[in-house]
UniProtKB/Swiss-Prot annotation:
The lineage of its organism: Bacteria, Pseudomonadati, Bacteroidota, Bacteroidia, Bacteroidales. It comes from the Bacteria. Pfam families: FloA (PF12127). This is Flotillin-like protein FloA. One of its GO terms (cellular component) is plasma membrane. Found in functional membrane microdomains (FMM) that may be equivalent to eukaryotic membrane rafts. FMMs are highly dynamic and increase in number as cells age. Flotillins are thought to be important factors in membrane fluidity. NCBIfam families: PRK13665.1.
Length: 333
């Protein structure tokens, strides 16, 4: 009695679990949607996708979209292989459909290669149809007259599908355009000619073929704004003048130091000579005493020498100016 009571409950629970597992591993409604859309795929293939960890809700909608767009050569195996390789199936299918509608030549192999290279293949197709405008950051350059100019440009580019794999990106385009603007302004004779004809910059930059080796084709380069910056030439001249002044001051200080050193050296030599004179004068009394003892100097000779010294001292005193600004007058006889 109890077994017959629990049996329906077990069957119901088991049936619910079976249906959950069935619809999880076998997406019946997705298979039905594919059949209605004309995509040939079986329930066994959907079940095997689950076993291979390939989500059917990504592969089947892509197959339906490609089939509706007339791209019937795209197979389920190709989409599965691209997903397992780490690609974006939805973006690849969207890109192929957009390229087909826009008459852009794009194969499935090329689209998957672009996607696996890290590029947004759908955005690339959109850029091929609708060119993209890139605003450059302010580019600073100096004309030959020393005036600094700050320019901003707008670069219109179109994606080159064939160059997306291995081609340089937007940063390279911006760097090359900035280099071209700097070169064009730097070769101008003065800043006025640049302000009068800003299109000359665009023409010169376009002639350089800056899009070589990139994933884009440059359609146009337009100078959006040009501002006048600093007078770099005048600033450099001022800096040079200050440097020359500092050099001259340093040389003058060096000469002054040498002159002071030379003066001190001469004073030292004078002190040395004075010391020698004093030393020699100290020897005079000794020599006179020796002359007296040897009889070479008489008393009259000694007094005559003293008179000469006194006369010399008197003449020196007369020749010296007084503190009041007048000279000493000679004594009246």
């Amino acid at each position: 009695m109890e077994t017959s009571l629990y049996l329906p409950i077990v069957l119901i629970v088991g049936g619910i679990i079976f249906l959950i597992l069935f619809f999880h591993y076998v997406p019946f409604f997705l298979w039905l949607s594919a059949k209605v859309s004309g995509v040939n795929i079986s329930l066994i293939q959907l079940f095997l996708m689950r076993i291979r960890n390939v989500p059917p809700y990504i592969i089947v909608p892509g197959m339906i979209e490609a089939h509706k767009a007339g791209l019937k050569n795209i197979t389920r195996d190709e989409l599965e292989a691209h997903y397992l390789a780490g690609g974006h199936v939805e973006k690849v299918v969207h890109a192929l459909v957009s390229a087909s509608k826009a008459n852009i030549e794009l194969s499935f192999q090329m689209a998957t290669a672009i996607d696996l290279a890290g590029r947004d293949v759908f955005e690339a197709v959109q850029m091929s149809v609708n060119p993209k405008v890139i605003d450059t950051p302010p580019v600073t350059a100096v004309a030959k007259d020393g005036i600094q100019l700050i320019a901003k440009a707008r670069v219109t580019v179109r994606a080159s599908i064939k160059q997306l794999v291995g081609g340089a990106g937007e940063d390279t385009i911006l760097a090359r355009v900035g280099e071209g603007i700097v070169s064009s302004i730097g070769s101008s004779e003065n800043h006025k000619s640049v302000l009068e004809n800003p299109d000359s910059i665009s023409k010169l930059v376009l002639r350089k073929g800056l899009d070589a080796g990139t994933a884009f084709e440059i359609l146009s380069i337009d100078i959006a704004d040009i501002d006048i910056g600093k007078n770099i030439g005048a600033a450099l001249q001022i800096d040079q003048a200050n440097a020359d002044k500092n050099i001259a001051q340093a040389k003058a200080e060096e000469r002054r130091a040498m002159a002071v050193a030379s003066e001190q050296e001469m004073k030292a030599k004078a002190q040395e000579a004075r010391a020698k004179v004093i030393e020699a004068e100290a020897e005079v009394p000794k020599a006179m005493a020796e002359a007296f003892r040897s009889g070479n100097l008489g008393i009259m000779d000694y007094y005559r020498m003293k008179n000469i010294e006194a006369d010399t001292s008197m003449r020196e005193n007369i020749a010296k100016p007084t503190t009041g600004g007048t000279t000493n007058q000679p004594l009246s006889k």
